[in-house]
UniProtKB/Swiss-Prot annotation:
Residues 392-453 are annotated as: SBD2. It is an enzyme of class 6 (ligase). It comes from Humulus lupulus. SUPFAM superfamilies: Acetyl-CoA synthetase-like. Its main location: cytoplasm. Coiled coil: none annotated. Keywords: ATP-binding, Cytoplasm, Ligase, Nucleotide-binding. It comes from the Eukaryota. One of its GO terms (cellular component) is cytosol. The gene is CCL8. Gene3D superfamilies: 3.30.300.30, N-terminal domain of ligase-like (3.40.50.12780). This is Probable CoA ligase CCL8.
């Protein structure tokens, strides 16, 4: 059954500067449908039940650290239940229209048993406790969480929101102005996420959350779910044009986090330093959902900082024989991050180098993924820290499928072997057969496979083999030890830039909107820091070319193109290299052979 949240309730939480609690002000609220079933994520079922128990050790454990504050599991789940109640309650309208104060007692009395029927809820927040409670509250209320990228310009946000038919935006105050503006252009409602009180919070209006009061009956009710229900839509980076919505169910999420927690031995003693985006499966699953499932602690660093990471590790391990209580034990990043960390290390004075290397060596686990890790970077990192980075392989559609072992040989240049329960098939390019030794397209069948591409049934169907294997579009092979080697994309139109898979076609379509651009071709050229660099070959329009010649300057500069495009493309999609040509080499069918063009430029540019 498809229910549009707008038709169920128009609930808007808006900041009121003069009210004692600006996050509890409501307007135009109509009742949600209340059905006798909840839709919390399956991975939370046992955790929620355990936390709900009186005196549970799980309840007092630190789940999230952010902005120098700590948040327990009980506080997170209590706050998530309040968000569920806000989304699903019919009582809030009455209290607002009657001019009554919305009190903690009133909120505690809300049932939280509403069911959003799979309505999509956009989550817009920096990495924080509020982001986590926004997702959990959406799941508890029966909604589907759609994390929205903070780096997206307005045009891309509008595409994702319109495509997924988002009915409600949950946002923090720092993104309120932009998201209210965007919500006004769509059918979505807007709500602020109430701040989650930390362990040392003194916020009187929400003191009930400090103790983590939880309606146990409501939690237990809402964890009885249908695990085939959609839970999460994560948008791809746009590998075939516009980004596609990848729908994961409670079942696929559950399968993945259990697999990761077991394979990499996540425990309550682990403390993760998290500096990855939360609209990408690396940041969502590897570094957030799986640690929370294992009752670990996740410490958010909202923006990647070379100095900040090295400093946090040194604080964790002041000497080679000592550590603090909140010491970081696990770190996962993309190759570019490790390149930057190496550069930062090399710029240190000898004494700071010694302290930094000593601290890094004491972490339990360091992992790398989202794009190929250059072997020289792996070797440099191992020399500095003693860690041989654990590489693994995944995609938005199945999260993680292959990994080097936690214990055992981690082979440079490979991504390891399939996880238990995961099947990987290599299909030859002629598609007449498959084997485990030759080169071909990797196809994956896994319990964590996505349900579908959102509202793209034909694309979904064509992405699978008849026997249920997902076609990754990545070329690979298996070495003599059974380790998988990823050779790259099967299409020249796909680029991997700093961990993101980008579509050259999408970027081309935007650049062609520029009045100076007559023709363009976008491809990825090798880059030592980002894997590939977005490179644009442009044929200027005749008038622009003539004007440039008269003024003895290029028809368009990289700076001009960058400045213009940054309002239309996410930062990581912006061209960083520009070539101005008189024409593009095309075949008889009018197509540009990008593979040959890439080879030619790579040789000419010496990259």
């Amino acid at each position: 059954m498809h229910l549009n949240l707008k038709s169920l309730c128009s609930l808007t939480l808006i900041s009121q500067a003069k009210t004692s609690n600006p996050f509890l002000s409501f307007s135009n609220c109509r009742p949600f449908s209340s059905l006798h079933s909840g839709s919390a994520n399956l991975i939370l079922m046992e955790l929620l039940k355990e936390v709900a128990k009186e005196g549970s050790s799980a309840s007092v454990g630190v789940a999230i650290r952010a902005d120098q504050k700590s948040y327990s599991y009980k506080q997170l789940i209590s706050s998530a239940q309040r968000i569920c109640s806000l989304l699903c309650s019919t009582d809030l309208k009455a209290s607002h229209k009657a001019g009554k104060q919305v009190t903690p007692a009133l909120i505690n009395g809300l049932s939280g048993h509403g069911h959003l029927g799979g309505a999509r809820v956009g989550i817009v927040a920096k990495p924080s406790a509020e982001f986590v409670t926004g997702v959990l509250g959406t799941w508890l209320s029966g909604g589907v969480a759609v994390p929205l990228a903070l780096s997206y310009p307005e045009a891309e946000l509008l595409h994702v929101m319109t495509d997924s038919d988002i009915s409600m935006i949950l946002s923090t105050e720092d993104h309120q102005e932009l998201m209210q503006k965007i919500a006004a252009k769509t059918a979505a409602q807007f709500s602020l996420i109430p701040p989650v009180p930390s362990s040392c919070s003194q916020e009187g209006a929400v003191d009930h959350l400090q103790t983590g009061d939880i309606n146990t009956d409501s939690i237990l009710h809402n964890t009885e779910i249908s695990n085939e229900n959609p839970a999460l839509i994560v948008y791809t980076s746009g590998t075939t044009g516009k980004p596609k919505g990848v729908v994961h169910t409670h079942k696929s999420i559950n399968a993945q986090v259990q697999t990761l927690a077991k394979a990499w031995e996540y425990t309550p003693a682990d403390q993760f330093l998290h500096c990855l985006p939360l609209h990408h499966v690396h940041g969502l699953f590897n570094a957030l959902f799986a640690p929370l499932y294992a009752r670990s602690t996740v410490e958010f660093m909202p923006k990647f900082s070379v100095r900040g990471i090295w400093q946090r590790w040194r604080e964790s391990y002041p000497t080679c024989e000592t550590k603090v209580d909140d010491c970081i034990t696990v770190f996962t990043g993309v190759p570019t991050m490790y390149t930057r960390l190496i550069q930062g290390y090399e710029a240190m004075d000898p004494e700071l180098k010694e302290a930094s290397a000593s601290a890094a060596k004491q972490l339990r686990l360091m992992m790398c993924g989202s794009s190929a890790l250059p072997i020289p970077v792996m070797q440099q990192w191992q020399t500095i820290t003693g860690h041989r980075l654990l590489e693994r392989y995944g995609m938005t559609e199945f999260v993680m499928a292959i990994s080097n072992p936690l214990k055992g040989e981690r082979k440079a240049g490979t991504v390891g072997k399939p996880f238990p329960g995961v099947e990987v098939r290599i299909v030859a390019e002629d598609e007449n057969g498959s084997d485990t030794t030759g080169v071909g397209e990797l196809c994956v069948r896994s319990p964590s496979l996505f349900k579908e591409y959102w509202r793209l049934p034909e694309v979904t169907k064509s992405s699978f083999t008849d026997d249920g294997f997902f076609k990754t579009g990545d070329a690979g092979k298996v070495d003599e030890d059974g380790y998988y080697v990823i050779l790259g994309r099967t299409s020249a139109d796909i680029m991997k830039v700093g961990g993101y898979k980008l579509s050259a076609l999408e970027i081309e379509s935007v650049l062609l909107e520029h009045p100076t651009v007559e023709e363009c071709c976008v491809l990825g050229l090798p880059d030592k820091d980002y894997g590939e660099a977005v490179s644009a070959i442009i044929v200027p329009a005749a008038e622009a070319k003539k004007k440039g010649e008269e003024e003895s300057k290029p028809a368009i500069s990289l700076e001009e193109l960058f400045s213009w495009a940054q309002h239309k493309l996410a930062p990581y999609k912006l061209p960083t290299r520009l070539f101005l040509w008189d024409s593009l080499p095309r075949n008889a069918m009018g197509k540009v052979n990008k593979k040959e063009l890439k080879k030619k430029l790579t040789v000419e540019q010496g990259v």
